[in-house]
Amino acid sequence: MNRERYLQEIDAVNAAGKYHPTWESLSTHPVPDWYREKRLGIFLHWGVFSVPAYHDWYARNMYIKGSPEYEYHCQHYGQPKDFGFKDFIPQFKMEAFDPQAWVNLFREAGADYIVPVAEHHDGFQNYRSELSHWNAAEMGPHRDIMGDLLVEAERAGMTLGASSHRVEHWWFLGHGQEFDSDIKQPMHLGDYAWPAMPERENQDLFSEPMPTDEFLTDWLLRCCEIVDRYHPRILYFDWWIQHSAVKPYLQRFAAYYFNVMESRGGCVINYKHDAFPFGIGVPDIERGQFAEAKPFLWQSDTSVMRGSWCYSVQPDKAVYKAPQEIVQDLLDVVSKNGRLLLNFGPKPDGTLADKDVEILHKLADWMRVNDECIHGTGLWRINQEGPTKIQEGQFADGASRNFTSEDFRFTCRGGNIYAACMACPADGKLHIRSLREADAVSYTHLRAHETLANLV
């Protein structure tokens, strides 16, 4: 690819388009109506990190001497100088990948959008790329797994998104340069581990060394390539796009994305923290949610496992949430004007773990009875009732919440109010205090609590 020409094309689109790379212009981009109808999405963390089956930050931590991952790697694969992270790529085969079967499972579970990881922090692209040879079409699976999933998502009428975690690659493999490993200088643009810079405080907006123009230009091109190749209607970014050095490139990308997708029904960017000024895109809370309902759209992304986003066989990582807890999260998030992006970590052979499939089947069973209280609903004047308090903010799902039969979540549609009991009453009786006599409520049916019990 001629990188300079591609940059010129990007800037030309922004110059001629409706949206320009300024916060003022980008703030005029509306959230499309179709996104307002979404409630449940499927997040897919797949990649080279699925092979060691530890967790999704294995590529970073295996290069930190003394870490559990380093010790595990040395014991099972040898020293990083002899067997580095890149040497897992041939084992990431996806030979049993059946995108149609995946999409059917997701659809039956009530999901209406899919967000696969296009590129994680490790720098391996799960799609066909002209910007790097380190991609799934040329290595590992030798197939465009993003493209294959897109075809099936469109067939099933689901919305395809994509996530990019590329910007964290600036420092993600940097610890590999602190000792004799396979990550060595000199490295250049296009090398797998490049740039492997020192990791300072990765939550600091102004941490140094600052990402260079060369790296950020490459980041911009990679993001635009995803847009041009797959036209994802949702683009999810991880947190480090909030870094001050990224902001001008983020503006250029957002303008390009909005302009390209304008004729395709619009698009949405999910972001964290203050990466965008409020009103541009949809804010996301990782492994957490709001305590109260919000007048704006938002998203909670979480995983079916507490200790990992990717496939793992480690006892302390592969701790699955109960299906009941996942449904409780869905009810809580939707009642507060949110969307739930639920993550699964496929195996490196392209199959889903038995526990993943079991959870999807349980969700499907629950949705067959209770879908009408989720999809097509909106906020009622009261969204919740009960004694159990929700801890607001990110990384708050370390333990299950002890909901009681006095806890309810409310949604509404048309003239209907839906009350979902978050735990089953021992005596089979429900006491809903928010429904006063003045509300003139007609009780048609109460079903949600019955199937919620069967999810345990």
Where are the regions that the model predicts?
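Mature catalytic domains of secreted/periplasmic carbohydrate-active enzymes
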Residues: 1-447, 456
